[in-house]
Amino acid sequence: MNPDLRRERDAASFDAEKLTYILDGGSERTRRRREIENLILNDPDFKHEDLNFLTRSERYEIAVRKSATMVKKMRDFGIADPEEIMWFKKPQLINFVEPVGLTYSMFIPTLLDQGTTAQQQKWLPPTQGLQIIGTYAQTEMGHGTHLRGLETTATYDPKTQEFILNSPTVTSIKWWPGGLGKTSNHAIVLAQLYTKGECYGLHAFIVPIREMGTHKPFPGIIVGDIGPKFGYDEMDNGYLKMDNYRIPRENMLMKYAQVKPDGTYVKPLSNKLTYGTMVFVRSFLVGEAARSLSKACTIAIRYSLIRHQSEIRPGDPEPQILDFQTQQYKLFPLLATAYAFQFVGAYMKETYHRINVDINQGNLNELPELHALTAGLKAFTSWTTNSGIEACRMACGGHGYSHCSGLPNIYVTFTPTCTFEGENTVMMLQTARFLMKSYDQVHSGKLVGGMVSYLNDLPSQRIQPQQVAAWPAMVDINNPDSLTEAYKHRAARLVEAAARNLQAEMKHRKSKEIAWNFTSVDLVRASEAHCHYVVVKLFSGNLSKIDDKPIQAVLTNLCLLYALYGISQNSGDFLQGGILTESQLTQVNQRVKELLTLIRPESAALVDAFDFQDVSLGSVLGRYDGNIYENMFEWAKKSPLNKSEVHESYHKHLKPLQSKL
């Protein structure tokens, strides 16, 4: 054990193990998670070479082998609960890339969400047994986030009671679905439904794409891998082109919308029910953002505790680089953000499951807010995490650029989250639509609930000159609840400003849609402010649920740092709204620096509490034992270029060149 890390852990004021229990939702859940993780971590069947030294084809083959082995092991161990399946997979799937993964993350959830009881009875058993390997084919070459623009067609033929699927243009080719290229034999395809000469919009269809047994594509199916990407080397993201490909009528998922044998269309209770899988995945991605940022912070903070560099005072020993205030300022706000997102992820998972029960009982009242919240928070957390991982990499100096740090892999694996399941700017604009509708409701005298209930107070919140001096005295920068109120007022102000700007644009634009485009920057800002408020509110609200006083004290400091750092980065909003004065902003900046000092001795234990095993962290710099330099040297020696003392290129190219000089 590195002596610096041992000393840092001993100096913490709280028990990291107890904080792990809080993050997991209880000590029993921690025990069970570790029990399941150890089943795979101690299994020799999952040992393999460092993926960094393998070709893409080799990486894909290993990922498929591991996936197949995992399925067998899960059957042997009787692991069937969705959360326990995730616990089992994550230690070996570094950064969560798995060719068969969409079978569990999208294919089965869509079947459960949109399939009838009969369809579930038919398709679930072979899918759970992995005779059916599924993917989710929504995105096309020419359209992604704009779902209504998707071009793939499914035309009903009442004579044969079949749907005829076509990719009518090159831009309609399905593009990007994970596992589609070489792994999957079935896909849930989203296509424009045509029956009796009418188009009824997007619907989901189960489409067999490869023959069972031979795995060859069926006639009418052209399918393959889209080629190398920025990351995700183990994943065979694919393309799918269909030419007059027929499937039975029963392959349309018909829990909500239906097509009768004669072609009669029965519409669903709500068109948004079709988007249930996306809402599920977006709520899941908030938790993944927390996990990825927590990993990056763990690596960067442990490295910063081990790395000694430069001098603070001439002649003194080289300090740990985490003793530099600038390094703390880079990393501790991100650490606070990682904890904030942990609580937001837990809230989103709980909220999705609660509202999904209501939806299955026909109660759609909370669906609009769930859709808006998952869209906005998916964008907010993934944008923040994406830039945060890169900040952690740069905080590790030159070594952060090496794959041995694990940070490049975390980054390239996470960064597509900003564009898949909805491009983030468009997601923010979807949230903005809900905010504008809620604002209009309040403006017309109705009350709104949920996370937008702060809009009910808008008439009394409109800042008048005499109120500006009175309001700031109410903000206590050492009180998370008071800071939550400040964020609430900021969100309300920016939502109202966007609504007024939209109304002003509508007066001299040709249509509401054009006015919307000319207000879109303001609308995105309003959505960001709303999401920022939600995160502060949820972080602050969880503090009172913590009984352990030392842990509560440390998390309170993290919550304060998260909120105050956010104010310092968006100071104009708080000044313009009359929420804070200039002198208070000076106090905010000073308090941020004080909090860095308070968090410094707790930092090792705070990242230990995330409880990442070295295998799942995949980093030499972030090793639990801190022995980074010895292992960095051993890692480098494994490079394929080092297999021979003299590389063959010397004899082929350099030696002949030198002989002619």
Curated annotation (Swiss-Prot):
Names of required cofactors: FAD
User: Which CDD domains does the annotation name?
Assistant: AXO
Name the UniProt record assigns to this protein: Peroxisomal acyl-coenzyme A oxidase 1
Q: What species was this sequence derived from?
A: Phascolarctos cinereus
GO CC annotation: peroxisome
Looking at the record's lineage, which domain of life comes first?
Eukaryota
Q: Which PANTHER family match?
A: ELECTRON TRANSPORT OXIDOREDUCTASE (PTHR10909), PEROXISOMAL ACYL-COENZYME A OXIDASE 1 (PTHR10909:SF250)
The record's principal subcellular location, in a coarse class, is other
Q: Which reaction does it catalyse?
A: dodecanoyl-CoA + O2 = (2E)-dodecenoyl-CoA + H2O2; octanoyl-CoA + O2 = (2E)-octenoyl-CoA + H2O2; decanoyl-CoA + O2 = (2E)-decenoyl-CoA + H2O2; tetradecanoyl-CoA + O2 = (2E)-tetradecenoyl-CoA + H2O2
Indicate whether Acetylation appears among the record's keywords: yes
